[in-house]
């Protein structure tokens, strides 16, 4: 019997707070320029994108404050854990991202980092608008109600 690869098994890191803190308007897949020791560290699962963001600087897209743990078997100089990493998108997508962030209140948020089918590290980024506290409460209330509804349906059936 053939093994089916689970898409979540290729997941490296996920920004779980992104959908809670932001309204994600559009998602874009971007490549990321990494060093060899960074890729090896990602294969071991040492990454965190929860506090990171992306920005367009001098006509290029950069991931800022993304954490990749040091690879222990690397040579002594290894890599810097929180360095700026260049994101690879097409010129059309870059122009769209730049115009989106030029609008007030819009930002580029990393959503998920994963290996694609060819084993290349990809980053799913989203054009997002920050939620206010009342929006967060509304999202939380909807989620709680849907859980309660599912629990009641399960009890009654």
Curated annotation (Swiss-Prot):
It is found in: Cytoplasm. Residues 136-157 are annotated as: Disordered. Residues 136-151 have a biased composition (Basic and acidic residues). Keywords: Cytoplasm, RNA-binding. PROSITE patterns: SSRP. One of its GO terms (biological process) is trans-translation. One of its GO terms (cellular component) is cytosol. InterPro entries: SmpB, SsrA-bd_prot, SsrA-bd_prot_CS. Its main location: cytoplasm. GO terms for molecular function: RNA binding. The keyword Secreted does not apply. It holds the Pfam family SmpB. HAMAP family: SmpB (MF_00023). Belongs to the SmpB family. Required for rescue of stalled ribosomes mediated by trans-translation. Binds to transfer-messenger RNA (tmRNA), required for stable association of tmRNA with ribosomes. tmRNA and SmpB together mimic tRNA shape, replacing the anticodon stem-loop with SmpB. tmRNA is encoded by the ssrA gene; the 2 termini fold to resemble tRNA(Ala) and it encodes a 'tag peptide', a short internal open reading frame. During trans-translation Ala-aminoacylated tmRNA acts like a tRNA, entering the A-site of stalled ribosomes, displacing the stalled mRNA. PANTHER family: SSRA-BINDING PROTEIN, TMRNA-BINDING COMPONENT OF TRANS-TRANSLATION TAGGING COMPLEX. This is SsrA-binding protein. It comes from Cereibacter sphaeroides (strain ATCC 17023 / DSM 158 / JCM 6121 / CCUG 31486 / LMG 2827 / NBRC 12203 / NCIMB 8253 / ATH 2.4.1.).
């Amino acid at each position: 019997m053939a093994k089916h690869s689970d898409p979540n098994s290729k997941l490296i890191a996920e920004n779980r707070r992104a959908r809670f803190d932001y309204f994600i308007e559009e998602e874009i897949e971007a490549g990321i320029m990494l060093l060899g020791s960074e890729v090896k560290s990602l294969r071991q699962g040492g990454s965190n994108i929860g506090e990171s963001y992306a920005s367009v600087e001098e006509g290029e897209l950069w991931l800022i404050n993304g954490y990749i743990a040091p690879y222990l078997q690397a040579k002594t100089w290894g890599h810097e854990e929180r360095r700026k990493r260049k994101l690879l998108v097409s010129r059309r997508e870059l122009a769209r991202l730049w115009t989106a962030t030029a609008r007030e209140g819009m930002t580029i948020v990393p959503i998920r980092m994963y290996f694609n089918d060819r084993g290349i590290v990809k980053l799913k980024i989203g054009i997002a608008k920050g939620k206010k506290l009342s929006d967060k409460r509304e999202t939380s209330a909807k989620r709680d109600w849907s859980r309660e509804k599912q629990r009641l349906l399960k009890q009654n059936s």
